[in-house]
Amino acid sequence: MIDFTLTKKQQELKEGLNQLGRYVIRPMSLEMDKKKDVPETFLRNFMKLSHSFRSEDVNEFTDAAATVNKVRDPSKPSQSNRTAAIGAEELAWADAAMLLCIPGPGLGGPPVRATGTPEQKERFLGMFANMEETELKWGAYGLTEPGAGSDVAAIRTSCRKDGDHWILNGRKCYITNGARAIWTVIFATVDPALGRAGHRTFVVEKGTPGFEIGKIEEKLGLRANETAELVLEDCRVPDANLLGGEEAYASRAGGFMTAMKTFDNTRPLVGAMAVGIGRAAYEYARDFVKENYVLSRPIPRYAAIAERLAKIGRRLEAARSLVYRATYLADMSIPNAKEASMAKAAAGQAAIWACIEAIEICGAHGSLQTEHALLEKWFRDIKVYDIFEGTGNIQRIVISKRILTDLKAF
């Protein structure tokens, strides 16, 4: 039986991040969006704060603790994924772009933890475990290409063996923190004709000859977080950076499964972020109604608005429950691909709908761009949550495949 009750540490984390978001992050949110950057001073102070709350759960959320180098014993239940989801929701409630800027291995962390050799985990994750309080380092995850987004098996970035190195050629696009990452997990193929069986995964370090930063994208939302193009031209990567070593690719889909397993961990967190943005819009619309409508008047006059608020709240609560279920399964080391996709798809759609409804409830006020009315910004930020890490259509395909291959799924 799943218990959704928060532990004392989780409740403290939730309340602390909510206060930080309300009084520190929210007031600078629109300015960060306009300048397309999060001040380094804030990020350094945030890292100091995370170090001052040295607990296993908070370290798991910031992804900067020594424990990230260890493979967790599957027989010992954890709450780290759920704790990360709780933190992600609260920080996305404040500003989702800022959340994506928090130093750490980011999306690059899960594949290194899941399939890296002990030496690779020590080397690449250790860079963050030993990070000083005011030190800023990022990792990144390079999967998407101009011609291969949702269709992961269609990647065309090539890799070929050359002595004790690999030569990589290709382009990666829409890479979160790609320009400032100290290393990026890059997916490539030895032969496109092999499909997923030809995939290989590398950790490519910043400064590697042939590894360059392309353009920084101009975006609809999440503008304070950079999204970059990465270019590999005869990029020489040592054998030691082949994730998991040669033996990891003995199966026909080793590299492909690395990508899929990453999504099983990260999609629930994307769902949690979407819930945070949707909740922000919902609460703003709710408070707007309280302040601007005389609700003591006959109910029929305001029933339509009240009903809309009720539907928003209901959908967001349902989405959060799916997120918690997916993270519970991850913490128990139980396969959760179906539940991760359900959580991500439901949360993204619920939050997009919540932002649209909130703007309509607030009328013209909802379309304003002011530091006190962030609905316009949240509306721009939320759309990508139904796109990245697998579009809504892809999530439905994943869900349907799991249901049809396991008729006892429900």
Task: Go through each PLM region and give its residues.
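Amphipathic, small/basic residue-rich leader segments at the start of a protein or domain
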Residues: 1-102, 123, 134, 403-410
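Glycine-rich phosphate/cofactor-binding loops in nucleotide/flavin-utilizing enzymes
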Residues: 2-3, 87, 107, 119, ...
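Glycine-rich beta->alpha junctions and the first turn(s) of the following alpha-helix
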Residues: 2-13, 76, 212-317, 385, ...
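C-terminal helix-coil-helix/basic helical segment that borders enzyme active sites and/or dimer interfaces
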Residues: 26-37, 286, 290-297, 313-346, ...
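N-terminal glycine-rich flavin-associated loop
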Residues: 85, 96-119, 149
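FAD-binding glycine-rich core of flavoenzymes that anchor FAD
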Residues: 94, 114-143, 161-164
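Hydrophobic, small-residue-rich alpha-helical packing segments that form membrane-like cores
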Residues: 145-155, 161, 166, 173-177, ...
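A short core secondary-structure module
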Residues: 169-213
